[in-house]
């Protein structure tokens, strides 16, 4: 029976859980615990000899250290940087001199460190307490030592141990570390800094300072029944041996920290958290070799503070600190976040998130603590307001910072990252809204109280960078007349400084100051805009043009109302002797204002805008064009935030819209519109950026109707354009306006009810568009080809009646007089377009509801078109259809998106509406051939519907080939597979699409077109319809080449390809290519 091998001096079998080392002499294996070799020390041993071999071979030899840096790659010390924490580093650090911390550290007794002191002086500098008396701090007896820690916490508790020399950490049981601590031969410098004992027996004998317990968010605001447990950061035990060093760091979560030295001594190196120092710290910490750079060398000042036995040090949030232990030390500490340094805590937290640094003392669920604090602050603010009290300024500022962070964390793109720390049963959006409202109330009341003692002009502080646009002040929340009186008094002092402000008008940093007071502030801003002198003539045109582009309809009523208020209230506000009288009037009207506020906030925004526009219609402005334009433009540029206190809870979205409006470019032209015989400047620009907010569009579409009837003849002199001036002068290609067609169409739908439908719009479009439109056609196809097309149509189940050809005939005769000029205009539009090709797809988009209207009706309407012109909205850029023509054609909308990038499509500004009939003379484009497509389609249709006509078609093929040399037509292939398939692909889209839309078929007598834009009798390369200019161009060129190839090999190409034997198979293949179910041209 085989025996189990045994090892080591203890002669025990191999144990996988124990570390073993091999002797280089006897080749036996020994347990590290038996021969006194630690696992961490083994890599440093070069040749190992067991205790038995040491007698004959000598002691074990260690590897030679080339450098104190942990990168011991054999380089000399003068080349390699010194590693932070190494023996060389500690020796040099001890010998250096630093500025004394007496300049920055505040020394207080325990009784002086109170909540009132911190609220009055803040907690921005370190505080040192010489004794623990009065701090409310509980500590063990001075005889308490490391072995007692082991007894209270437990010997088997795992702790993170930092190897100071290498600045690395490893796991170790507390019992093993205590053994190391008491050993006389310490081969390494080990440090324990994160032994958190709040859930152990030692928790009862250590109590944090009372001021910390009063400030701590975790202690006060974290619910006991929360699903997420409280962060365990309040009580740490620090066991540090001599020469322990912790490199520069900021506490996690921007937490403040307190230290109390029970035994020994600690030296703190402190750096102020200025913006420059924080930026330097972030750069240093993110570098790969930061462990070889002493951070204190990069900043202007690093203070040295020695904390001796029995002393307590409080380090504020954000301070960058490093810690050196000159002698063995036992200390206690704890981290806490609080309301006094919310801004710095958030900043430090953001730095921590960006650095993604792994730390031994994290602050878990920091964002969850913030949510609980936000809920607490909301309840606290509400209670204070009900008791006619105001929160402390640091609370208001902290609430604004927290609310801003809430908004950032709940954004759509950031929600996934932050939703794990969102507390249960918390409604973030409601909390943000309510907290913003309470902040606004507190800010306004606080500013009013500050300005109450003196009537002098108060110095307005610039708004905080973290401040958010808040909710409007509701009079219902104003608790007492005293606050109201204070607010009115605060509204008066800002009046005198109006004269010095106008020179700063072109700048935009002033608006945030305006909402200082609810009503008075608004009037002040409005009056400033009204009374300011006009700018230089050189900048006036730019200002006026800029105003036209950025003013939207939702703002115009408010601006006009603002001017009206200024004119009506100016005398009151100039005199300073009416304070009491004004106050009494406002007190009497308080209920009215309250009801009006509630009424406004209970209604949708659109209703409020429409009501204000009715007031705008009744408002008469005294002043000339210059004054009006200047006021309106500056109202937008300088007073955008002034308008906001009037709005309801959607103030955040509205402010965002205003911000986007400000970035729009200055228009280089004015837009004019004609309405009911009167002319006025169109204050609502037609072209808009693509990033226009949808909410803006809905406002415009809802409000356009009441504003449109212009009843103020005072605006008439502003117009410089003639009624009879040609609309051609204002035509321009605007590719950016295409996404806006739908929203503008919706406006016209509401006011186009009096029009006679799409026919009147078609007639109107011809006049709006000028002479740039062509509706003429060309001679139709031959009768034999017509029969082939009829066969194809019957196979595709497309109905066709003879009467449907009449529109083409009538429009042919009707437009003969304009054929030459129109065709030239179309050519110019095609060649001058480029990127505007998708506009030429509009004819088929606008016409699907009009397939069966005869041209006799159209002719009668054409004679009466002048009667309908006044009821139709006419625009130089767009012509809008009536209500029924926009809804049933999703396929065309998707098609227009696909072809936006075409570079060679023809373009005409008026090609959106009008009958889709053939054009006469159009220029040929290289490589665009249609004849092969026509013959292939005709052949496939003929074989399907008339089998007996196949022989006739084959007989004609020879004569067709002879003619091809003269007229440049590729040979006609009836049964070969390559060319007909590609021809069918691009051609029957034209056929079927126009059958659905215009219904043009043959009529007896004379050559007829097989489909609009396709004629077999005249061989022209450019025969493709505007709807398929991109696809047909590429397909025709390929089919031309293929047709030539197949024509040359006609003798041996009698055999058909698989799946192409019959026209039905070929047609099925074509239909599969067009996956949207339509045959598109």
Swiss-Prot record:
Keywords: Activator, Centromere, Chromatin regulator, Chromosome, Dioxygenase, Iron, Kinetochore, Metal-binding, Nucleus, Oxidoreductase, Phosphoprotein, Transcription, Transcription regulation, Zinc, Zinc-finger
Ranges of compositional bias, category Gly residues: 826-838
Residue intervals of the JmjC domain: 197-353
Segments of skewed composition (Polar residues): 773-788, 796-808, 974-990
Major location category of this protein: nucleus
Region (Disordered): 450-560, 722-756, 770-1062
Subcellular localization: Nucleus, Nucleolus; Chromosome, Centromere, Kinetochore
Biased composition (Low complexity): 809-823, 1021-1040
Pfam families per record: JHD, JmjC, PHD
Residues that, per the record, bind Fe cation: 249, 251, 321
Binding site for 2-oxoglutarate: 246, 259, 266
Biased composition regions of type Basic residues, renumbered to the chain: 842-853, 953-964
Zn finger intervals (PHD-type): 5-56
Biased composition (Basic and acidic residues): 545-558, 729-743, 868-877, 919-928, 1042-1053
Entry-linked SMART domains: JmjC, PHD
This protein's record includes keyword NADP: no
EC id: 1.14.11.-
One of the record's GO cellular component terms: kinetochore
Gene Ontology annotations of biological process type: protein demethylation
Disulfide bonds: none
GO terms of molecular function: dioxygenase activity; histone H3K4me3 reader activity; histone H3K9 demethylase activity; iron ion binding; transcription coactivator activity; zinc ion binding
InterPro entries linked to this entry: JHD (IPR041070), JHDM1_Histone_Demethylase (IPR050690), JmjC_dom (IPR003347), Zinc_finger_PHD-type_CS (IPR019786), Znf_FYVE_PHD (IPR011011), Znf_PHD (IPR001965), Znf_PHD-finger (IPR019787), Znf_RING/FYVE/PHD (IPR013083)
Sites of Phosphoserine modification: 1022
Free-text function comment from the UniProt entry: Lysine demethylase that demethylates both histones and non-histone proteins. Mediates demethylation of dimethylated 'Lys-9' of histone H3 (H3K9me2). Recruited to trimethylated 'Lys-4' of histone H3 (H3K4me3) at rDNA promoters and promotes expression of rDNA.
Family according to the record: Belongs to the JHDM1 histone demethylase family. JHDM1D subfamily.
Name this protein carries in UniProt: Lysine-specific demethylase phf2
Organism: Dicentrarchus labrax
């Amino acid at each position: 029976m085989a025996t189990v091998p045994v090892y080591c001096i203890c002669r025990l079998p191999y144990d996988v859980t124990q570390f073993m080392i091999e002797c280089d002499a006897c080749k036996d294996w020994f347990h590290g615990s038996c021969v006194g070799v630690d696992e961490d020390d083994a890599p440093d041993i070069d040749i190992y000899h067991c205790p038995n071999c040491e007698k004959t071979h000598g002691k074990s030899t260690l590897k030679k250290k080339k450098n104190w840096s942990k990168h011991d790659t054999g380089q000399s010390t003068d080349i390699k940087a010194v590693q932070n924490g190494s023996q060389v580093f500690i020796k040099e650090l001890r010998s250096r001199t630093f500025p004394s911390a007496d300049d920055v550290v505040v020394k207080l007794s325990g009784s002086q460190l109170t909540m009132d002191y911190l609220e009055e002086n803040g907690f921005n500098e370190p505080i040192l307490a010489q004794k623990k008396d009065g701090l409310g701090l509980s500590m063990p007896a001075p005889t308490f030592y490391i072995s007692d820690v082991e007894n209270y916490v437990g010997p088997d508790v795992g702790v993170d141990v930092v190897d100071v020399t290498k600045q690395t950490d490893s796991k170790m049981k507390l019992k093993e570390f205590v053994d190391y601590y008491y050993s006389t031969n310490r081969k390494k410098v080990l440090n324990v800094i994160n032994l958190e004992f709040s859930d152990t027996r030692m928790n009862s004998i250590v109590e944090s300072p009372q001021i910390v317990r009063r400030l701590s968010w975790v202690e006060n605001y974290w619910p006991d029944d929360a699903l997420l447990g409280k962060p365990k950061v309040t009580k740490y035990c620090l066991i540090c041996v001599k020469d322990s060093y912790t490199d520069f760091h900021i506490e996690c979560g921007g937490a403040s920290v307190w230290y109390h030295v029970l035994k020994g001594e600690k030296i703190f190196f402190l750096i102020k958290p200025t913006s420059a120092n924080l930026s330097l710290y972030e750069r240093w910490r993110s570098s790969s070799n930061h462990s070889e750079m002493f951070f204190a060398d990069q900043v202007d000042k690093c203070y040295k503070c020695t904390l001796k036995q029995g002393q307590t040090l409080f380090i504020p949030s954000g301070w960058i600190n490093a810690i050196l232990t000159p002698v063995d030390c036992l200390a206690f500490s704890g981290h806490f976040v609080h309301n006094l340094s919310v801004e710095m805590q958030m900043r430090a937290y953001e730095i921590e998130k960006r650095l993604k640094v792994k730390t031994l003392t994290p602050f878990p669920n920091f964002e969850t603590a913030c949510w609980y604090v936000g809920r607490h602050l909301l309840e606290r603010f509400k209670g204070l307001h009900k008791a006619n009290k105001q929160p402390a300024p640091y609370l208001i500022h902290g609430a604004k910072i927290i609310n801003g962070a809430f908004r950032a964390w709940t954004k759509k793109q950031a929600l996934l990252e932050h939703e794990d720390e969102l507390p249960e049963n918390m409604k973030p959006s409601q909390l943000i809204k309510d907290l913003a409202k309470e902040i606004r109330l507190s800010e306004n009341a606080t500013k009013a109280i500050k300005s109450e003692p003196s009537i002098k002009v108060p110095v307005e502080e610039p708004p905080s960078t973290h401040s958010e646009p808040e909710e409007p002040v509701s009079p219902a929340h104003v608790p007492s007349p005293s606050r109201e009186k204070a607010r009115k008094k605060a509204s008066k002092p800002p009046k005198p400084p109006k004269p010095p402000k106008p020179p700063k008008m072109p700048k935009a940093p002033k608006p945030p100051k305006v909402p200082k007071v609810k009503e008075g502030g608004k009037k002040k801003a409005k009056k400033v805009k009204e009374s300011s002198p006009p700018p230089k003539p050189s900048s006036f045109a730019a200002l006026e043009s800029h105003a036209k582009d950025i003013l939207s309809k939702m703002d115009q009523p408010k601006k006009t109302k603002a001017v009206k208020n200024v004119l009506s209230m100016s005398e009151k506000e100039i005199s300073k002797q009416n304070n009491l009288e004004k106050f009494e009037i406002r007190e009497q009207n308080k209920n009215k204002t309250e009801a009006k506020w509630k009424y406004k906030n209970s209604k949708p925004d659109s209703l409020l805008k429409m009501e204000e526009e009715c007031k705008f219609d009744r408002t008469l402005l005294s002043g000339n064009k210059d004054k009006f334009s200047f006021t309106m433009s500056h109202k937008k540029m300088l007073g955008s935030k002034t308008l906001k206190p009037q709005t309801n809870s959607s103030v955040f979205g509205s402010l965002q819209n205003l911000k986007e409006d400000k970035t729009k470019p200055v228009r280089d032209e004015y837009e004019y519109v004609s309405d009911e015989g009167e002319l006025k400047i169109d204050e609502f620009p037609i072209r808009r950026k693509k990033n226009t907010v949808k909410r803006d569009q809905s406002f415009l579409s809802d409000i356009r109707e009441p504003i449109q009837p212009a009843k103020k003849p005072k605006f008439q002199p502003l117009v410089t354009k003639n009624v009879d001036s040609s609309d051609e002068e204002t035509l321009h290609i605007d590719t950016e306006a295409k996404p806006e067609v739908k929203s503008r169409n919706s406006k016209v739908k509401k006011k186009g009810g009096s029009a006679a439908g799409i026919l009147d719009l078609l007639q109107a479009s011809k006049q709006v568009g000028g002479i740039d439109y062509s509706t003429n056609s060309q001679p139709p196809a031959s009768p034999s080809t017509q029969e082939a097309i009829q066969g194809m149509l019957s196979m595709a189940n497309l109905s066709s009646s003879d009467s449907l050809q009449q529109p083409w005939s009538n429009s042919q005769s009707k437009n003969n007089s304009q054929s030459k000029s129109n065709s030239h205009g179309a050519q110019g539009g095609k060649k001058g377009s480029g990127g505007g090709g998708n506009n030429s797809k509009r004819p088929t988009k606008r016409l699907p509801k009009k397939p069966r209207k005869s041209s006799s009706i159209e002719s009668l309407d054409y004679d009466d078109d002048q009667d309908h012109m006044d009821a139709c909205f006419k625009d130089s850029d767009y012509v809008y259809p009536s209500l029924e023509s926009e809804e049933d054609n999703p396929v065309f909308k998707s098609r227009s998106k696909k072809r936006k990038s075409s570079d060679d499509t023809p373009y005409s500004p008026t090609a959106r509406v009008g009958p889709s009939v053939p054009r006469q003379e159009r220029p040929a484009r290289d490589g665009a051939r249609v004849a092969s497509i026509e013959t292939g389609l005709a052949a496939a249709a003929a074989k399907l519907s008339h089998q007996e006509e196949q022989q006739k078609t084959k007989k004609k093929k020879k004569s067709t080939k002879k003619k091809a040399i003269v007229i440049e037509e590729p040979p006609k292939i009836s049964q070969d597979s390559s060319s007909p398939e590609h021809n069918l692909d691009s051609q029957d889209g034209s056929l079927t699409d126009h059958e659905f839309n215009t219904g043009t078929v043959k009529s007896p007598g004379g050559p007829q077109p097989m489909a609009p834009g396709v004629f077999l009798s005249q061989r022209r390369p450019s025969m493709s319809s505007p709807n398929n200019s991109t696809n047909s161009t590429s397909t025709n060129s390929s089919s031309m080449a293929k047709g030539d190839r197949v024509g040359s090999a006609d003798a041996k190409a009698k055999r058909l390809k698989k799946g192409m034997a019959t026209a039905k198979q070929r047609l099925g293949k074509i239909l599969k290519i067009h996956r949207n179910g339509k045959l598109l041209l």
